[in-house]
Amino acid sequence: MASSSSISNHKIPNTLMFLVIVNFLYLIQTNSAVSISSNSNSHFSRFSRHRSSPSSKTKQGFLATVQESMNHALLARSLAFNLTLSHRTVQTHTFDPIHDCLELLDDTLDMLSRIHADNDEEDVHTWLSAALTNQDTCEQSLQEKSESYKHGLAMDFVARNLTGLLTSSLDLFVSVKSKHRKLLSKQEYFPTFVPSSEQRRLLEAPVEELNVDAVVAPDGSGTHKTIGEALLSTSLASSGGRTKIYLKAGTYHENINIPTKQKNVMLVGDGKGKTVIVGSRSNRGGWTTYKTATVAAMGEGFIARDMTFVNNAGPKSEQAVALRVGADKSVVHRCSVEGYQDSLYTHSKRQFYRETDITGTVDFIFGNSAVVFQSCNIAARKPLPGQRNFVTAQGRSNPGQNTGIAIQNCRITAESMTYLGRPWKEYSRTVVMQSFIGGSIHPSGWSPWSGGFGLKSLFYGEYGNSGPGSSVSGRVKWSGCHPSLTVTEAEKFTVASFIDGNIWLPSTGVSFDPGLVN
């Protein structure tokens, strides 16, 4: 049998030939994409003048750009897959960011394939926003490994072409999206949602009443000893409904990945600090930030309840994610997320966190999802000497993305001087409202990322906060900073308006406040 190195050497010429062919196809198809985008723009211009009667040409123009993006995504995936075969190593994670791109492209293809003329507007907006985020993440992983991974340039070229097409699709969609969506007034908001008895069973009922599909116990008293085994077993036996996996009290030293195709997974533990999942991957340890996550969930409808996610790589290990979520319509309830730098990666799509504790140091809540935190405890730990703490680092890279971080009715505290956030990407968007802000939050509130980057294009808002750190008199004076939002402005970042939670959250059984809290 040939050695792995000889196999790799044999495949490299084929890979290079494949690159030449793919790049040639990209040059041809990009020209056609420009033509389609140009024609589609004219369709959308007509639609903008006659919004009440969109023509079939308008829809066809938009769908054509989506199809073009999908064609390029398929080519990019073929390239990524070929590169994973040609660059096998013993320590794959240390050198190969292409696996990140491959996983993200699968997610993008899943979303693009679901777009058709009759989709709900907010679903389409979410999918296009997430597809762009996936490209940003692929490029970030390639950049993190640029010195050790020599095929990164080819993948980066393909990724950037796809990014351009997805940007065109998103721009066209935003240009025609209904501008007349009615925001509920404060008086019209219904009170805190209380789930029905049947819905409450999902997130409130004792485990014994849940009719779980698998039981995981380290001592062998369940159906499986590891979470990974339970996920694999239930995925093979799934009938398409919700899969409920009970994790008995104990410490699980595993890295868990719930892929895009594994939807509606619910992990149920015995409580914070009782059911604990621990990992130690870190950027300094050779992993891309994306792959450092102790638990990663990409499958739509993910729910986690009553457990703790930990990355114990330590404060000197740089990026080390405890929980990464890129699952649409996901809920994290009564959990704890513990780490240092980059503890919680709210990667993409619509997410909701309730009664959850999040601890960390640098940028410990980051990503580009549309996410609302309610009734959570957010605590910054003591940083390393000379290090500064930032609660958030929101990653919105395009003004058309419907993403951002909304922190409502939470407690934000810190062991040392900490900033509410800084702009990871140019159009970073974060709002803190109706929350308690401790005295260790810096009077300026927000910090630059680097120089003047994003300070005019970001959106940082505050509304109705309390506590010794809530005074806005010393807040930064950037044009993108809004320390005193109006009621109307704040309502845009509530559960009902920002993540359409009043539509999909009831089925999860979690209690939530759809609007501003009285």
Curated annotation (Swiss-Prot):
Pfam family membership, one: PMEI
Entry keywords, A to Z: Aspartyl esterase, Cell wall, Cell wall biogenesis/degradation, Glycoprotein, Hydrolase, Secreted, Signal
Chief localisation class: secreted
Disulfide feature: none
Site (Transition state stabilizer): Q341
Tissue: Expressed in siliques and floral stems.
Statement: the UniProt record of this protein carries the keyword Magnesium: no
Family that this chain belongs to: In the N-terminal section; belongs to the PMEI family.
Function: Acts in the modification of cell walls via demethylesterification of cell wall pectin.
Extra remark beyond the main annotation: The PMEI region may act as an autoinhibitory domain and prevent untimely PME activity during transport.
Protein name: Probable pectinesterase/pectinesterase inhibitor 16
Taxonomy of the source species: Eukaryota, Viridiplantae, Streptophyta, Embryophyta, Tracheophyta
